[in-house]
């Protein structure tokens, strides 16, 4: 099992007997990746390192990748402001019955529906990886990365 301590939320996506372990990994931004962990990831030799953050997030905290790993880097931006815009719109519409669960459910639907081209490209990358590891992340490794994990787990 690959252990990366300098990146939050780094873990294998595999669940259950249908999924192979040590092929798909999710995590938070890789901005604080230390030398030891860079070497571990280089040894893993991933097919791709997919970043779901938008350009503003990337500029604020770029991934700390080696030259070798930068060659594997793919940006598939999904705006994190989707959730904030939705909350503001609900308040404008007078929907004061905002519950955390409802807001999250609606924002996840927007992440899926407004970025179908991104999800299609993500799946194509996975299909082309030929059982070579893939790492994917966003800022916290929760929402966009969680949706990506959910898609994979449902497809398998």
Describe the predicted segments one by one:
Residues 1-135, 147-156:
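Cys-dependent protein tyrosine phosphatase-like superfamily
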